[in-house]
Every structure is written in C-alpha cells, then in structure tokens.
C-alpha cells in the first residue's frame, strides 16, 4: 500500500483536488441512493429538484470541512462524515420500511439507549446498502492514499472550524436566515404536523434536506410566554363563586384507571377496508355498557408522548407550536401540574405503568416530575409476563394494575400506556394489516376481560380507555 500511496497518481495535487471536491457530491448521492433504493429515481430527483441536491451537497461540504480542520487529515474527516451520513441513510431506510415515518431530528431525542430502538426493528439484508458501504469504504481508502493534510496549527484550524460550524448552525436554526436559504434552493419548509404532512415534504426535499428542515422546525417550536401571564391571572379565570363547596365526607373516591391503548384504531371507518368479522365485537359490547365517543390524537406512526402529554396535562400540543416532543419544552427539576398531581392532592396513590424501557423518550426522568408516586416499566413488573409478538401483552399490564389497586390503601390513579400492538407488523404468513388487526382483536378481548374482573372487585373503579 505504501508503494501505491507514493505513486504519481496519489501524490498529484490534481488528484487530491478532484477527490476532495467530489467527496461531498459522492456522499450526497450514496446517502440518498441508500434510502431511495433506485438509481433512476435518484437521477430523476437530481434533475427535477437540482437546488435541493445542491443544498444537501453544501451541507455535507460544511460538515466535512468542519471536521477536517479539527482532525487535520482529510481521510479521517471523510470517514467521520461518511459514517454519519451512511448511518442516516440506513436509519431512514429501515425506519420508513417498518413504520412509514421518516427520520427526523426529533428522533435523536427519543432515547439515550440505542438498544431501545433496535427492539422496534426487524432488520433485513439490503444489497444496495451493502454496495454503498463498499463504495464509501473504497473512497475513504483513496483519501487515505492521497494523505491530504491541513498544515496549520490547531488554534488556526480550530478557529476556522468554529466559524464553519457557527455559520452552518445559525443558517439552519435562525428562521430569519433559514427562510431565504429555502427560497434560494427551492426547499419545502412547510411545517409538518404528522407523518402524512411530513411525507409530502419529504417528497420535495429528500432525506438530507428534510432532516435539516426538521432541525429548524424543532428550534422554532419553542414556546414564548404570553404577555401578562401569571398563576394569579389563571386562577382568577378559573374561580367560580357560584359553585357550592362539597363536603369531603360525602365524596366517594373511586379508583381511576386511564388506558392509552397502543396504535388502536377502528379500521371499519375506512372505505374499502375488509375487516375480518369479529375483530371489534368485544369493543362494541363494551361501548353498549359505557359512554363512548371519538378521540382525535395529535400524532400518527410515532411520537406517542405527544398523545400522552395531552392526556396528562389536558393541553393540546397545537397550543405549543405542535412541538414534536412537548415535554422537552418543560423546565427540568420542576413539579408539573398534571392530572396525576391533581389526584395526588386529593389523596390518591398515583402510578404510571408502561411495559417498555424506562429510558425511551426519557420517561423515567421526565415523568418523575408529573406527580406520580410510582413509575413502573418493563423491569418493574411483578406479575407473570406474557407477550404478543415482541411486546408485553395487555392482559399482563391489566393484572399489574389490579395488583397495584389491591396492595394500596385508599384510591388509586393509574395511567397505563400499553405496548401490545406496537409495530412492526411484519409476518411470513400474514399481511401487515392482518397482523395489526389480530392485535386489535386481542386488545379488545383483554380489555373486556379486565373490565369484567373489575366488576367483581369491591373497590369502585372508573376506567377511561382511549381506543
């Protein structure tokens, strides 16, 4: 290799120039090809949305040179840059394949534990991603053979790197600067509210640019405090002098069980949808005995915490600039005024129950400030665990809730977020919709069993189920 490294070709400044100039273009192409899985579609997008590809290439160029000035050697800067964007390409491909949702900046805030994310994925071999990896590796080897170095002392290199990073950061995060950038390059910076609106934006931007737009959206979702806002003002608006006080001794405090059922939807409302007979029979039986209606949630295909936030605070995320992860807007180490907090003040024992990892979305850290006496995740379950596919089933969670109510003195408030019917829905012997609807049927059956057991309990209990 040393002989090859010293050859006229790899020692030529012209060769160095060509490899350095083409690197961002090459990485841009490999990144988009990996997630698009079609050379013809990539070429068509390049010709029809040329400005987008130019912006993506310039962004890669900025990151490439930002790293280069820090590490001095171009092949190391190239390796770091290529690894970053190849990882983005793989994440986008597999995430969209499994969930139908695109990779966004907010996804990076979902978990501090990468192992949590792998539980959602059923990875399969992809020849084009493997080919891209080999081509990228070959290019990095060529950069190593060129051995391009920035011959400047670190203070100078560090200063230049800082300038590149600073200019790039403010260009992406400051709305007044990002808006004209979008105009120049034809970027679709439409605000995305869910997977459907993001799909339309992604078609116009592709992976790299859409990810950059999601960075700007994350920053601009910051909420500003209204003028003259104060706790006293809110309390004065809520006070009702005409309401007669109720004697505490006359109040019956039933257990409150709040169930947020994973990925539940009534597919009978979709035109042309062939739903197997009996799928929702148990749900219909439950509705005959209960008050029921339709619920509208602020998310689809991901970001469960958006719905959780609305149900815990009674506050629509739309009022918070549709923040992707609304609890990220809250100040740290401050007790939050949630429904759990309200019930706790009324003498309830409060529990949050979610049979998944405590680190996902940072729930354990954040929800400890929501007024819950106890947080229970998958490692905290004390009843025998059963699973549907890869996740703890609803029956296990309901029996855990029953155990909590039996062991505590006084009334309980339990917020349950289930996991049973979470994606992926892939199966060798059924369609994704078929697998999903089988999970729905099981969810309905196990909810009815839970309600029937509660009817036999001596403790009065109200169940609110978001289905």
Name these PLM-found stretches.
Residues 2-201:
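Transmembrane and membrane-interface helices of multi-pass
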Residues 81, 104-108, 205-210, 395, ...:
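Short, well-ordered coil↔helix boundary/capping segments
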Residues 99, 105-106, 195-208, 298-302, ...:
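Membrane-interface micro-motifs in multi-pass membrane enzymes
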Residues 99, 106-116, 128-130, 210-218, ...:
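Short alpha-helical interface patches
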Residues 108-111, 204-208, 231, 280, ...:
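Alpha-helix initiation and N-capping motif
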Residues 119-122, 128-129, 240, 246, ...:
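Membrane-proximal soluble helical/coiled-coil segments
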Residues 175-258:
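Membrane-interface segments at or immediately adjacent to transmembrane helices
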Residues 241-254, 260-261, 266-467:
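Solvent-exposed soluble domains appended to multi-pass membrane proteins
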